[in-house]
Amino acid sequence: MATKTKTASSAKVGPKGITFSGDTFVVPETHDMVKTLFDPTVRKSNLEFIILACLFSNLLVFWLVPENSLRIPIFIGFYIFWRLSYNFGIGYLLHNQSKYNRLVEWSRNLRLFDAKSNSALSKFIIAEIKSQRGAEYDIDSYPIEFNTWLVFRKFVDLVLMSDFVTFICVVWTCAINNNNEFLHDQKIWLVNTRLVVGFGLIVFNFWVKVNAHNTIKDYAWYWGDFFFRQINNEELIFDGVFEMVPHPMYSVGYIGYYGFALIAKSYTVLVIAIFGHFLQMIFLHYIENPHIDKIYGPSKNQINLFKLLKLRDLKNFDNLKPLVGLYNFNYLRGSDVMNLILVGTYAFVLPIFASSAGNRFDFVFFLAVGIKLLESFSINTLLTLQSHSKFFTKWYLSNDIPLEKSLNNWAVIYNSLINLTYASLFGLNFYQYLQGFTSELLFSQWLYLRVFVGLLLIFTQSWINSSIIDSIGYFGWFYGDFFIPKSYSSMQHLTKAGVYRYLNNPEQIFGVCGVMGVFIMVPSVENLVCCFLWVANNFVRINFIERWHMIKVYGEQEVLQDSGVTKTFKKHLIPEVISRRLSNDTENNQNIRRRKSSSFTITDSLDNFIKELKTSKTKLSKQKLIELSQSLSFENSDYKLNVSGLQATTEKDSEYLPNYVDVGSPIEVQWTSPKETHSERDWIGLYRIIQTSYSRNKTLLSSSGRWTFCKESSGKFTFAGNKLFWEEGVYEFRYHLNGSHDVAYISEPFEVRIPSVSVPLDDSKSDELAKDLQVKFFSKLLNTRSVDDSISEAASESDNVLEVYKLLSKIISQATNVSIGPKVFLQHDAPNTVATLSSKIIHIKKVLEELSNIQN
């Protein structure tokens, strides 16, 4: 590129470059194309004069073609030529240079920089470089790669500047067509708004280009890394505008084109802008991105590791990619087929039937609203319960279903409901289409513009969703952090790669922008209501459920750090003092949140409510219990019952509690009755006080086998096994006369407790837990002798095996505070022993503990 004359010493100052063959050199200073071509203080090279002549030659069209309507197709043809030269001409050269080092090889084979060569092309190229760099520039002291890049830059200057100039000519000719049409046929406020917004987009586009060039310099602007590398520039730069959006030169770097279309009020300009932007995205995908991955991307080992992590992620989904919308559809998977049927029914079948049945618009609308409300309430409620109490996970683990199944089945529920909402929304608009859009629209102008913007928003939502899945995988897409502990997942930290580099919550707006697009295309009141429901639900779910759960799991430092957009906004668009103040306020707010003992989340409020319910129970004194149990008429009775084997309560408030016995422990009862009135058919029964307190003198309730005859006037009997209640509560013994249910005496009430069993988190202590369970429960209920005895064989001696399993699961759940279900004992993939059961309980405990672990 042309530059001012430099001294030899200054030429040696600058960044260091290295070719792909290993030669190092000092990279001289270069300038951008605008300064090179239009700054009069910068010397112009031979090719630069030719480029300027080509640019100004476009003005000949205005002189030679007086009819403006004829100029438009001419400039459109020019623009298409230069745009194709850009994306396919430069693209072809860069592709070959990246793959085969083709441009450098051509230079070497043609001896372009060999002063001894007699070819006219070589002499012209050498003269061109001398005119760019100055007469003192020593071509031989620089590698052929750098010199080739200097020549390549001139071709880039010609194509890019011609592309932009011809586009401006298209804009100008379209704007002034039909006597300055862009200023007429609209209300003045609308014209002014259009001009202000259009100029705003152009100014923003200009800022993006300037900021991008200041960040990456000429080296990257002219694709220098296709020819050589700069030392200490081995990583991609994420600063300035590159921290705001991915590939800003190709994304928001073309937003000014749409500003020009808005100013010109021309669909022709809009189509040209879309055409150019579309080709640029193709160039990015097929030329730029492959080279970026080659130069700056991960190594093959890292790529393979990433693929393995993705495959490992699929273990939560039966090792198959789960259905997202209708993507990853598998006709052999029942849930996928059902989703397809439901989507087809709500999107097409119901609207068609409703249309053929007359005006059923209200039915279709309320159906869409009802389904969205159902999805919002059910998904938000389930996520809240899962975050608070691990509701979903507990149910699966208690039934001995693998942890991964909970996430897989949740994914089916979540995706099915989401599919229903979008299918019903589509069905609502399909019905309006079938009816000829008889519903009154809020506005009906600019149909083509509305369709373009609407489709663009729908595409944006699809692209953002795809980018989210690429960044966080299916695990993150389906809220895996709610269901799977961090130690079971490949995601140990929140990702800041992909789209999350620029936005903390990209789905906050872009996750529902497609619904906004539907409203823009069909702006009916019904679509406005649906749009509001989608946006409101999305806001609540992200900010009041997902965000607070992420803080629990990953901590505030990871969740609340500024996104790339926020950093750039603070750095470039607001004063430094205010930016610093905002940062300090954020830190202070985080410190305040750490110091507060109370929480603001929905789940913690629910937790406090449950605790209040537990502590609000009225306590009865021991005397009150005795009075409740015993009739005062028995106080001086000749009949007596003494219960032995009870333990005295040693707790702080023992005055409120009766004596107790551990569940399953034998209870010995001694009776005494008058010999002269004693009958061999007198009997003693065991009852729960809450079931018999309404009748003191006569028992109206069956003892259900928990009784024994008193054949002697005095004696004792031990209640054990099936003659006991195997659940907590307050109980009593009753002495009955002569085979009847007439009560002669009621014993002192006593409590049956389930002893607490501590569950360790260390697998090595599984044997200790197994022995504890064996002694306290299994030896008493099933008569097992060791932790390795089969539970199934011992339970089969009972008349009702399933009832035994239900009883065991209930007792063990209460004792260990780890919920298990009867199905735990029905699995045959491992020996069904107390030892294996203890291992399962420890596993469940570890999972729930890790899910409940809140970062400070």
Curated annotation (Swiss-Prot):
GO terms for biological process: methylation; phosphatidylcholine biosynthetic process. It is a multi-pass membrane protein. Its EC number is 2.1.1.17. The keyword S-adenosyl-L-methionine applies. The chain crosses the membrane at residues 47-67, 74-94, 156-176, 188-208, 244-264, 267-287, 337-357, 363-383, 410-430, 440-460, 509-529. Residues 1-46, 95-155, 209-243, 288-336, 384-409, 461-508 are lumenal. This is Phosphatidylethanolamine N-methyltransferase.
